Amino acid sequence: MASASGSPVRVRFCPSPTGNPHVGLVRTALFNWAFARHHQGTLVFRIEDTDAARDSEESYDQLLDSMRWLGFDWDEGPEVGGPHAPYRQSQRMDIYQDVAQKLLDAGHAYRCYCSQEELDTRREAARAAGKPSGYDGHCRELTDAQVEEYTSQGREPIVRFRMPDEAITFTDLVRGEITYLPENVPDYGIVRANGAPLYTLVNPVDDALMEITHVLRGEDLLSSTPRQIALYKALIELGVAKEIPAFGHLPYVMGEGNKKLSKRDPQSSLNLYRERGFLPEGLLNYLSLLGWSLSADQDIFTIEEMVAAFDVSDVQPNPARFDLKKCEAINGDHIRLLEVKDFTERCRPWLKAPVAPWAPEDFDEAKWQAIAPHAQTRLKVLSEITDNVDFLFLPEPVFDEASWTKAMKEGSDALLTTAREKLDAADWTSPEALKEAVLAAGEAHGLKLGKAQAPVRVAVTGRTVGLPLFESLEVLGKEKALARIDAALARLAA
């Protein structure tokens, strides 16, 4: 795909460094990245850091770190450079001021001296009369005398862009043809009274100067598109822009209660998913399904498969609901796709202090390597590894009291005694032999394997649910396992 003029694809990802990155931001970055890579185009990473009150260097560093962790690369931007540097808006103020002045000089913009109180009064009157409540164009055609009077009153004007008195129609890459009537798109501010340029100016100016061909962004910015198209036409006339980019607006991501997922929702924080041990490839797989799909019958795929198939015209316009359980399930599938060696290494952060509850010297690498393939079949997120293998490295199992109560019913002492005898005589190099031993103990007490192994599992691991029992027994070792059964029998007898 190329732009309307046939130039190569150039897309941008332009977050603000405010707070922790959130999953909606990641979904937008993913779709732009995949679109650029699918078309062998260029991804521009631009930082919109013009809000001094909210932006921070810490958030900026988190953004870069998050992009790296997710595996995104960019062709122009921070740490990479490029022909349109600088790529931080805070370093481009002279550019915006120059463009604003050109718009004023050409009559595409004008100074507005209305106070907030005056704006509010006229807005309420318009609402009461059933008319559009946007800016009414009061300062559009001020005389020199009016300007002089306002200036003498000490009023500091903002700069507004002059919207054309005509409908604006464009074809959204996701939603199809959309038309905005002029009465619904009033003149809007582009420069504050203190001279600071607003997002409404800097974002399209940067897109124009960086020759962006396709703008893929959230649905919340759809209503700003007619204003930007009108501004683009003015920028083309001034020689600042070459063409109007194509726009595609991605569907809302909905959270619990069918409400739009906000960056303030804990569920939306990217850091939360990193801390829980989501794989980048698992999280990205799930986020890609929020508005897009590879095929009707395939939910699990690699990032390479997504790039090969991604077409923004396949993105659905309807809101997509974030389903945490499905996200976890897909991540679990990606955990099972890892090579075992890769899995063992990715689990490392959860196998050492301060996360791991065992002493560093009690961690046994050989036991970890032996149990890892079995653990890999069970996890949804990597952080679950700690509770699944703690029985191997702690001196005693940590008993979950609910599990103890559930498993240690009347007759459990007799079953455990028989199971201990059978296990003591079994071959501990064979999980199948250990299974036969517990099966035989169960048969001696009229129990099937599922009922027979529950007390053994709790005695050895502390829980009723966990990794495959007989492989766990083999890795733990005969001496420790039998000692734990003895301890459980003593507790039952107390």
From Swiss-Prot:
It comes from the Bacteria. GO terms for biological process: glutamyl-tRNA aminoacylation. Its cofactor is Zn(2+). The keyword Aminoacyl-tRNA synthetase applies. Its main location: cytoplasm. It is an enzyme of class 6 (ligase). Keywords: Aminoacyl-tRNA synthetase, ATP-binding, Cytoplasm, Ligase, Metal-binding, Nucleotide-binding, Protein biosynthesis, Zinc. A motif ('KMSKS' region) lies at residues 260-264. InterPro entries: aa-tRNA-synth_I_cd-bd (IPR045462), aa-tRNA-synth_I_codon-bd_sub2 (IPR020751), aa_tRNA-synth_I_cd-bd_sf (IPR008925), Glu-tRNA-ligase_bac/mito (IPR004527), Glu-tRNA-synth_I_codon-bd_sub1 (IPR020752), Glu/Gln-tRNA-synth (IPR000924), Glu/Gln-tRNA-synth_Ib_cat-dom (IPR020058), GluQ/Sye (IPR049940). The keyword Nucleotide-binding applies. A motif ('HIGH' region) lies at residues 15-25. Binds 1 zinc ion per subunit. Zn(2+) binds at residues 112, 114, 139, 141. It catalyses: tRNA(Glu) + L-glutamate + ATP = L-glutamyl-tRNA(Glu) + AMP + diphosphate. GO terms for cellular component: cytosol. GO terms for molecular function: ATP binding; glutamate-tRNA ligase activity; tRNA binding; zinc ion binding. It is found in: Cytoplasm. ATP binds at residue 263. Its EC number is 6.1.1.17. HAMAP family: Glu_tRNA_synth_type1. Catalyzes the attachment of glutamate to tRNA(Glu) in a two-step reaction: glutamate is first activated by ATP to form Glu-AMP and then transferred to the acceptor end of tRNA(Glu). Monomer. Belongs to the class-I aminoacyl-tRNA synthetase family. Glutamate--tRNA ligase type 1 subfamily. This is Glutamate--tRNA ligase. The lineage of its organism: Bacteria, Bacillati, Actinomycetota, Actinomycetes, Kitasatosporales. The gene is gltX.
